[in-house]
Structures are given as C-alpha cells and as structure tokens.
Amino acid sequence: MGLPWYRVHTVVLNDPGRLIAVHLMHTALVSGWAGSMALYELAVFDPSDPILDPMWRQGMFVIPFMTRLGITKSWGGWSITGETVNNAGIWSYEGVAAVHIVLSGLLFLAAIWHWVYWDLELFRDERTGKPSLDLPKIFGIHLFLSGVLCFAFGAFHVTGLFGPGIWVSDPYGLTGKVQPVVPAWGAEGFDPFVPGGIASHHIAAGILGILAGLFHLSVRPPQRLYKGLRMGNVETVLSSSIAAVFFAAFVVAGTMWYGSAATPVELFGPTRYQWDQGFFQQEIDRRIRASKSENLSLSEAWSKIPEKLAFYDYIGNNPAKGGLFRAGAMDNGDGIAVGWLGHAVFKDREGHELFVRRMPTFFETFPVVLVDEEGIVRADVPFRRAESKYSVEQVGVTVEFYGGELNGVSFSDPATVKKYARRAQLGEIFEFDRATLKSDGVFRSSPRGWFTFGHATFALLFFFGHIWHGARTLFRDVFAGIDPDLDAQVEFGAFQKLGDPTTKRQIITRLI
C-alpha cells in the first residue's frame, strides 16, 4: 500500500479479525515484558537487608507491584520481610513471573491464529452478509466483564475472602505486611491513605460497571446520539479508549507522587513531601519526647528509635533529589547503606544546643548554618573564613552522637565537627558502602519518581492522541467529504463522486 510508518494502523481500520490479532500481540508483549522483567529483577535483587537496602533502594520496579498485591515469598527461600521460607508455593515471585510468560506465549499463538483466520462469520451481518460490528453491544460486553473483574478483586482478593489481601502499613512505613482489608463505606473511604477505600471503591465501581454493562447490552442508543458521537466508527472506540487510559495514567501518577494506601513507603520509598514537611523528623521528635517523659536518658531514647524510621529521614531517599536523567538505582548514587551512625547533637561553648538547617529538596548545595531552638544563627561553615563571625572554630562547636553506631561518642575537632554538620544537612547520618557498586555519590530517584515521570509523560501524549482521534472521527465528513448521514457503506474508489447518493449505485463497465 506504500503507507508511511505513522499510517500503518490503517490496515486494521476495517479488519476486525486482524484488529483482534494486533491487540492480542500487544498484550502478549506486555505480559512477556512483565514476566521477563520480574525474573531479571529477582536475579539481581538482594533480599538480605530489608531495613537499609529495601527493594526501592535497589531500583526494583515490578517487585513492589507484586508485593502490594500479596506476593511476599520466593522459591529462593527468602521472604520480603526477611524470614526464611521453606515452601513458597505456586504464588511466589517466580511463579507469578512464569505465569505471565506462559500467558504471553498463549496470547502470541492466539494473535497468529486471528491474523491468519481474520475473515470470520462472526464479523458479518446476518442480513446483508457485509462486514459489520455492533460497537455499542461490544462496549456493553467489555463494561460488564471489566465490572465483574473489578468487583471480584475488591470483594474477594482485597478482603481476603478468596485471596491474600493487600500490603497494609502504618503511616510511617514500619509495620507493613500483607493482610485482609475491611471495606470502608463511610467518609473515611475517600481518604487516599485508608486501605479500606481500595476494597470499597472496587466493589462499588464493579457493581456500577456490571449495571452499566447490562444497560448497554439491553438498551440501544438513540439514532441521533449514535450518529452524533459516530458510534459506528471504530476510531470512536480508539478515541474513547485512549481517554480512559490517559485519565487512569494521570490518576496513578498523582497517587504515586503524593502517596496513597496503594503506594506504600516500604515498597516504593518515601515521597518528596515527607522530607519537605519533616514528616519522619516530627515522628522521631515525638518518640524522643515520649521517652524523656518516661525518665529515659537521651542516649536510651535515641537507641529506641527504629533504624528503619531514621533511614526514611534522610534526603537521599527523597525521589525528587535524583535527576530524571541519572540512570540507575539509588544504591548506584550514594551507595548501599550499612549502618546508622546515630543522631548528631551540636553544642557551642556557651552550652546552646544547635540544629543544622536541612537542605531543601531542590538545592544541590546549601550553606551549613547551625541555629538554636529559637532560630537564632549561632554557628556556620563560612564561605570566606576571613570575614567569618560564627565559624565552628570561633564559636567552639562540639558534636555528640546518641543512638546508632557512635552512641555516646563526641568530637570537638573542628574538621570532624564540620564534616558531620555537612552530613546533618541531609537528615540522619548513615554510613554507606560506595565501593561494591562503584557508586558515584550523585543522588538517584526511586521507582516512585520513575513511575510518576513515565505515567505523567505518557498521559500527556495520550491526551493529545485522544484529541486527535476524537477530532478525526467527529469531523470525518469534513476531512474526507463523506456525509455522516449516509446509511450505505461507502467503498472508497468505487463511485464517481465520493459520498454522492446519486452516483453510489452506478455500475462502471469496461468494453473489450
């Protein structure tokens, strides 16, 4: 046909059999990618330290999605929570990957079959014998089936009635595990951080989809609406399908970036707003105050802080710190975390407790400034020592560690104090192994950042695709000169004047 590359989909425009074939092949590719990617991630994933080297630090992308749906065990004998497993069963990480690859093969064969046997009687009108598809009825079938699937997921899988439940954790990502979820039918169900809303919304949306599907199967659209929305044109289906996809992509980009019950911190890493708002820092402060009210010493209080919570309060885990074009996992940036050094408390020679101002998200460099509890600047690491008034040396700043590996250790040497002051800008201080992966010290984003960027970008592209194909189908008569009220199926090139009712039945003969 000599079609340019951007027009090749024209070949399936009026060919339902091969339209099915290409969709089957596309689904085969998606399923095959998911299974293959899962096997690759399992080959490189190190499950030995779920606290300081979790899946999101290692750049895992598909493993978190399997985990949030209830998969936690591996045929390799490990569990995502750190326990040893003897019998992982069929629904392990490897089992799910294998099922996707087998499904991909079956879909591949089905695609070939439908490409070869494309002209089925199913696609022909019984009365006329001409190719035709009842698109409103097909829409009703799809709506009904997707409604059944949606309802079943919410009513059975998420609730644990017939399934494992989903990953549920506390707001600070410390106690996560897979468990059944009770549907939340009140106002709390609309809170994006309440897991019960996932169950109730899938149940409600599923029922709505089932009812809407039955409606579209039993009620025909009015003729004016049918023609006005071009319901007989398969490009209308394409346009509305793209709309559904781009809307879903925008929604999940938002729930991933801003956080939700469906995107737990333990599986995808913290959000940037948790650093901006000092979310984990405030919880740590609350716990320290609670411990001090029980007459525990500062050292004992900080020793009770979970290392997992302290690690969240570190800017290197902020997905917005990694540039979009810095490829690789977080571990390839600042390294593999091996231990918490403890909480650094700075004091000047007058006894004021000093706090290092933390680096905002979108700064690569930031002045080291130490303030007291009233926000008054007491010390800094100056850019120009000749004009300094508050340098560590002049003010006599010391640092002491509470909790962690350096618990009880103090330093008064200015060079050491300045080193830890610079590191305290980045939150809690950790020791990193940069040799194993040859980490370059430049922050990377987490899968949360990559997912958001990818889905927001493709949602925008698909939005324009929806506008494009919607305009093509709505204004087809304007673009091609075909009257939208023309009932007869037009065969291109067989008429003296395209779409002219007076010439549509004219027979052109050749005299030999």
UniProtKB/Swiss-Prot annotation:
GO biological processes: photosynthetic electron transport in photosystem II
Pfam family, one: PSII
Bilayer topology annotation: Multi-pass membrane protein
GO molecular function, one term: chlorophyll binding
Annotated localization: Plastid, Chloroplast thylakoid membrane
Function: One of the components of the core complex of photosystem II (PSII). It binds chlorophyll and helps catalyze the primary light-induced photochemical processes of PSII. PSII is a light-driven water:plastoquinone oxidoreductase, using light energy to abstract electrons from H(2)O, generating O(2) and a proton gradient subsequently used for ATP formation.
The protein, known as: Photosystem II CP47 reaction center protein
Organism (species): Physcomitrium patens (Spreading-leaved earth moss)
UniProt gene name: psbB
